[in-house]
Amino acid sequence: MHYYGNRNEYDILNASSNDSNMSNTYPRYPLANPQQDLMQNTNYKDWLNVCEGYHIENPREASVRAGLGKGLGIVSTIVGFFGGSIILDTIGLFYQISELLWPEDDTQQYTWQDIMNHVEDLIDKRITEVIRGNAIRTLADLQGKVDDYNNWLKKWKDDPKSTGNLSTLVTKFTALDSDFNGAIRTVNNQGSPGYELLLLPVYAQIANLHLLLLRDAQIYGDKWWSARANARDNYYQIQLEKTKEYTEYCINWYNKGLNDFRTAGQWVNFNRYRREMTLTVLDIISMFPIYDARLYPTEVKTELTREIYSDVINGEIYGLMTPYFSFEKAESLYTRAPHLFTWLKGFRFVTNSISYWTFLSGGQNKYSYTNNSSINEGSFRGQDTDYGGTSSTINIPSNSYVYNLWTENYEYIYPWGDPVNITKMNFSVTDNNSSKELIYGAHRTNKPVVRTDFDFLTNKEGTELAKYNDYNHILSYMLINGETFGQKRHGYSFAFTHSSVDPNNTIAANKITQIPVVKASSINGSISIEKGPGFTGGDLVKMRADSGLTMRFKAELLDKKYRVRIRYKCNYSSKLILRKWKGEGYIQQQIHNISPTYGAFSYLESFTITTTENIFDLTMEVTYPYGRQFVEDIPSLILDKIEFLPTN
């Protein structure tokens, strides 16, 4: 089902009244063809002719969008499954994901074709027919064997006492494990050299399924190999090794593609590649650790705190993007530096006008940190009222989030220098019970405008537009560039975070709860937020000597006991002090002497707590045995997540 309709259509309405509207859904492919030169040398009539090409979305465009939507849907399925009330159900996550990748009527591998088409258009390269054919044949063969395994797993669950069912199932499992190894070799740098980036999302999906299959060996292994005590352990070691191998492969090739765009100075392409590979590769591999059924034997409430950025509105206009200024300048103008996780609370906008053109000339975000009632104001970007104009505010109601939006900006008509700034924004806001629209409007109806929609703002399955009770991302920040080409030309980008993030840091009653430490409510001392490596699902907190942070939590159920566990890495011996607070005083304390992990993440088992209050704080402080000065310039304690494991 194609859910974008003709929102990609450019409609020119009633030229006699000089009122026109253009619709601009993106990402616009291919990446390797920036349109600055085209726009600078195209007159109005020619530009309208260019727009005619986007009148109806063709099958290729539909396939490309479906490939992106599949990545969105699979991540949401994983998050939803692990957060469900029963994890060892009769279907299983392996079955659910395989059904998404191989729908019942998909005999032509259309889903996998969509995934390949998406990456082809993303990086403007093509997979040869030979390479594509090899991959499709391998996937078709794998489909039959996956279906066979799923069928025998169901038969065994329906009749677990049947030794015949069990024997056949174990044989199917062993063969399928080998088949996955073969499929990986078909799409990796050995089987398809030179096509590693083009096949990377395919590789990630195959790797994901393989690890879920190996997870089955941990869930059912004590019954499958009751007479072979070491079989389950052997497959566990294989799962650990494959998790490392698959993660490193995806990160290495993702970074290579990213660096190719960075080296070429193509920030627009760099940002789009980063966003869409996050949605189709990095989000998936960030789930791999929770497939470890020994570390995570029950349901897991998990979150993705990474931030993605839209294409830049007006990014094709000269003066607002590279090569007019440096790659680093573009990154600072249109994205945020690493930061504690924030919740958008509203905006202050400044509206100005030049002649008959009225537009958004500057703005400021209002936000808060998790479980922190203080409202912070971001830096003002663009032109404030010092340049004239009026100020207005938009406030997002408490416990509400922007799940969709669209914008309108004045159309660029070469060679005139009229403003191309935003004139209208429509924010769709949800409290998860209903929706309301908050509108910024400076629009004059007698001027031609371009409408921009954000195609990655879908429902959780990635198959339809976002709805107030079913959405994948929420707006977290707006960035305005009003400094590189004067008041008539502004560039705008929007930041979004995943809808899995819990605004209250709620500790589930009967699930393992993972909460990224970047969701601290406050930090102090020599502490910084570091860009995540790509496989953690978000940024990390780096603590130096004599630094500390506070995290506030909400207990779903009182009088529950939990083991507290921290995922961290450290290249130097340090001391971590954890305290649980009640009011102004702490009621529990645990001091840990931490040894170096030499670059790898490890788990620290801390104290056991009881949820005696609905809301409580935990603090973390770091000291070093040789003092601040000695370790000031070396890597420090890096924290990823804090976890709460029900003791029962």
From Swiss-Prot:
MF GO annotations: signaling receptor binding; toxin activity
CDD domains (alphabetical): delta_endotoxin_C
UniProt keyword annotation of Endoplasmic reticulum present: no
Keyword line: Sporulation, Toxin, Virulence
Family of this protein: Belongs to the delta endotoxin family.
Extra remark beyond the main annotation: Toxic segment of the protein is located in the N-terminus.
Protein name as catalogued: Pesticidal crystal protein Cry19Aa
Organism (species): Bacillus thuringiensis subsp. jegathesan
